């Protein structure tokens, strides 16, 4: 993938108890170098599919015997349905376009309720029929409140509420109604180390702290990870406790442009996060932008570091993969990591995991 495509993906353009811990002080470069030296790199296996479909397979969601993969650059449809775990193609939906019911820029999909997000239009769509032998059908079309500013990721708190990172910088999260799209409330603060910068340039800070989010299956914790910094945050929905984990690569680094935009200036860090009943799984890169630019067309997008953490933020295991991946799905019962390699022609890859 070329660097101009990278930039398109990067910029489609206080609580009761708080704790911040500096847990992992080893840089991402050192982690990868050590794994290579010891011969401890986890080797992946390509999962073949029977049709040439993907251009930029970015997110994978699995529910029961079906999987949906979001492809950001597909010419016709954003979402593709497969059987799971054998990945037999079934159907596609989420037509790319500017017409009614079409999507300009798809951002994510969540199986609970079968909702998808179109940041380009500021809308959410709910589908039925996402299964083998069926044709997906759009059932609801919700226009999101304009006060949400930008909507680049989301997760569902319950059947009536969606959480979206707050890109205005006023808060960390926005909560909206799934029936009306109305903004219900905002919560938390961006935990930037320079509060004065947040006061002066809140939207730029929010862009520099662009985050991916994931609820635990029981909805008791909400986890966010930063795209441009080594920062993981865990928010308890019941106790309002907040745990912040700052890794060895530091918090997001960015520059404020004359126009007020937050331009990343440090590293590309987290690519995806998945929370299960037991663990938090994240895929991490850590390369510096200045080094990425030197690679030019040889640059491969994605992260090679899989971190497995407890719900309290303690890292219990770190894997180094043999290739970078952008999106992840961990099947704990099968002991398998499925990753999406956007640099290859065959983009679904699986890795064996040893989970306790």
Q: What label would you give each PLM region?
A:
Residues 47-77, 281-285:
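Beta-strand-rich domains and repeat architectures in extracellular enzymes and scaffolds
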Residues 58-62, 107-110, 152-158, 205-218, ...:
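Structural signature of eukaryotic scaffold interfaces centered on beta-propeller domains
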């Amino acid at each position: 993938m070329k660097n101009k495509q990278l930039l398109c993906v990067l910029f489609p353009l206080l609580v009761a108890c708080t704790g911040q811990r500096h847990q992992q002080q080893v840089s991402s470069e050192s982690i990868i170098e050590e794994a290579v030296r010891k011969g401890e790199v986890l080797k992946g296996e390509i999962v073949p599919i029977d049709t040439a479909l993907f251009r930029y397979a970015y997110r994978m969601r699995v529910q029961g015997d079906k999987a949906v993969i979001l492809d950001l650059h597909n010419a016709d449809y954003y979402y593709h349905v497969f059987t799971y775990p054998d990945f037999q193609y079934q159907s596609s939906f989420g037509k790319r376009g500017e017409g009614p019911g079409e999507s300009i820029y798809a951002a994510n999909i969540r199986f609970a309720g079968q909702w998808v997000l179109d940041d380009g239009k500021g809308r959410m769509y709910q589908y039925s029929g996402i299964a083998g032998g069926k044709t997906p059908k759009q059932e609801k079309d919700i226009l999101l409140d304009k006060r949400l500013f930008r909507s680049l990721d989301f997760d569902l708190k319950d059947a009536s509420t969606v959480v979206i990172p707050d890109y205005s910088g006023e808060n960390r999260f926005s909560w909206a109604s799934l029936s009306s799209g109305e903004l219900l409330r905002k919560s938390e603060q961006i935990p930037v180390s320079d509060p004065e910068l947040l006061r002066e340039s809140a939207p730029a800070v929010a862009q520099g702290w662009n985050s991916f989010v994931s609820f635990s299956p029981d909805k008791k914790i909400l986890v966010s990870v930063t795209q441009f910094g080594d920062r993981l945050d865990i928010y308890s929905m019941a106790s309002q406790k907040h745990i912040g984990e700052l890794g060895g690569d530091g918090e997001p680094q960015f520059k404020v442009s004359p126009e007020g935009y937050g331009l990343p200036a440090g590293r590309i860090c987290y690519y995806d996060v998945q929370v299960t009943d037991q663990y938090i799984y994240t895929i991490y890169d850590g390369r510096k932008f200045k080094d990425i630019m030197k690679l030019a067309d040889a640059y491969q997008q994605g992260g090679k570091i899989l971190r497995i953490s407890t719900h309290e933020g303690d890292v219990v295991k770190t894997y180094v993969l043999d290739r970078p991946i952008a999106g992840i799905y961990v099947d704990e019962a099968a002991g398998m990591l499925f990753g999406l390699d956007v640099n290859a022609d065959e983009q679904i890859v699986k890795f064996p995991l040893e989970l306790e």
